[in-house]
A protein has these predicted regions:
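Flexible "cap/lid" loop of the alpha/beta hydrolase fold
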Residues: 1-38
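Conserved alpha/beta-hydrolase catalytic His-Asp/Glu region
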Residues: 33-101
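Residue-level signal for the nucleotide or nucleotide-sugar donor/cofactor binding architecture
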Residues: 78, 118, 148
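Short alpha-helix in the alpha/beta-hydrolase fold that links the catalytic acid
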Residues: 88, 105, 119-128
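Acidic catalytic loop of the alpha/beta-hydrolase fold
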Residues: 90, 113-118
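Catalytic active-site module of serine/aspartate enzymes centered on a nucleophile-bearing elbow/loop
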Residues: 124, 130-201
Length: 201
């Protein structure tokens, strides 16, 4: 995730791409919204390309075709008009000052090592601004980490809740805790992937 401050629309490439998308993207998207029927027909024909792009920018480990299609339908179910408004809004977003509201609260920031849209450096900014926050970076995980590794994400959230309850019970100031950054591998998920590869062989 990201608190903003620029560089959110470069698709993991370069600042030049981000600037180009920020300038040209909204206009193109608003125009596409006027020819929705044509775009829908093109999407049907170009589904393999659409799925490949969604897979590339959403996940960093092999996932099922059904999950890729679910993510694609969710993303492209948004109107192009809304996307056109979204691009400049997210480029100008800067919520770093708002993070002070989380001070004194148990916070865990989770993101994927392979997230091309909001890489770990974006999350590190959040962690640096919230004393005592924990940063969990998951190997083999992309931008849609909550769909790619649902059990692991749920586990980390539950652990954060338990830490918060324990800190309150023991009267420990959360903001005095040292910052923790952990890199985690979802072993269960990795084994599933390996078994699937073996079945294909």
């Amino acid at each position: 995730t990201s608190a903003g401050g620029g560089g959110l629309t470069n698709l993991g490439m370069s600042p030049f791409i981000g600037t180009l998308l920020g300038r040209v993207g909204p206009g193109v998207l608003h125009r596409l919204d006027r020819i929705t029927d044509l775009v829908t027909r093109v999407r049907r024909v170009g589904r393999p390309i659409e799925d490949a792009l969604v897979d590339r920018y959403s996940f960093d480990s092999p996932v099922s075709d059904a999950l890729v299609r679910f993510a694609a339908d969710m993303i492209f179910g948004t109107s192009f008009d809304a996307m056109g408004d979204f691009v400049p809004a997210i480029e100008s977003m800067d919520e770093r000052e708002s993070l002070t509201a989380f001070r004194g609260t148990e916070v865990v920031v989770i993101n994927g090592m392979g997230d091309l849209l909001t890489p770990p450096s974006h999350s590190e900014t959040i962690v640096d601004l919230i004393p005592g926050a924990e940063h969990v970076v998951v190997e083999d995980a992309g931008h849609l980490i909550m769909l790619e590794h649902p059990e692991l994400v749920t586990q980390q959230i539950r652990m954060a809740i338990e830490r918060g309850q324990m800190a309150r019970h023991e009267n420990v100031a959360v903001e005095r805790k040292p910052r923790v950054r952990r890199r985690i591998t979802d072993i269960a998920r990795r084994r599933q992937v390996e078994r699937a590869k073996e079945r294909v062989r």
